[in-house]
Amino acid sequence: MKIGLLGKKIGMTQIFDPGGKALPVTILKLGPCLITDIKKMESHGYAAIQIGYVKVNGNKLNKAQIGHLNKYNMPLVKFLKEYKVASTENYQIGKWITVEDLSINQNISVSGTSIGKGFTGCIKRHNFSRGPMSHGSKNHRQPGSIGAGTTPGKVFAGKKMAGRMGGKKVTIQNLKIIDIKINNNLIIVKGSVPGKPGNIVSIYQ
């Protein structure tokens, strides 16, 4: 059964494997997530489940969100997300998905919002090389030429220039689950995960 879960990034640390090698790991607190809706191939044209995470008061949601959750008498949840599945036969509305549905040594993909860096130059943002720092040069950290002259007479779209960096959705694939703490809804994955501690993350197989 394909699993998708929402949760929060707790932070990074390191653990040691049986051979004494230090492994960089990230701790994630996932779920429990409630199946709030099921999209079937016959009625919607695709098969998916919708899950909800973090119970909230009604004043935190708009009327459309409250009406959607009240359709099946669901608890009010703040975050909703859909995950496509091959078949919806193994899922029921109102069922809870927890870390118990995951297994150690399983590979998962983790999506989150990367740390925003603000407005940055082309050296930090695109790894440009800087110009000379002496001998009369005034072109230290400038981008250089951004195109030809009269022909084409414009800067082409997508040109690498200074701008906002980070703060975008990033997905890291094939992170290995090292350990699962069922009582605390925690999993430990090898490697790093996008975003700051406390950020909402989405995991799926």
Curated annotation (Swiss-Prot):
Residues 130-150 are annotated as: Disordered. InterPro entries: Ribosomal_uL3 (IPR000597), Ribosomal_uL3_bac/org-type (IPR019927), Transl_B-barrel_sf (IPR009000). One of the primary rRNA binding proteins, it binds directly near the 3'-end of the 23S rRNA, where it nucleates assembly of the 50S subunit. SUPFAM superfamilies: Translation proteins. Keywords: Chloroplast, Plastid, Ribonucleoprotein, Ribosomal protein, RNA-binding, rRNA-binding. The gene is rpl3. GO terms for molecular function: rRNA binding; structural constituent of ribosome. The lineage of its organism: Eukaryota, Rhodophyta, Florideophyceae, Rhodymeniophycidae, Gracilariales. This is Large ribosomal subunit protein uL3c. Part of the 50S ribosomal subunit. It holds the Pfam family Ribosomal_L3. It is found in: Plastid, Chloroplast. NCBIfam families: L3_bact.
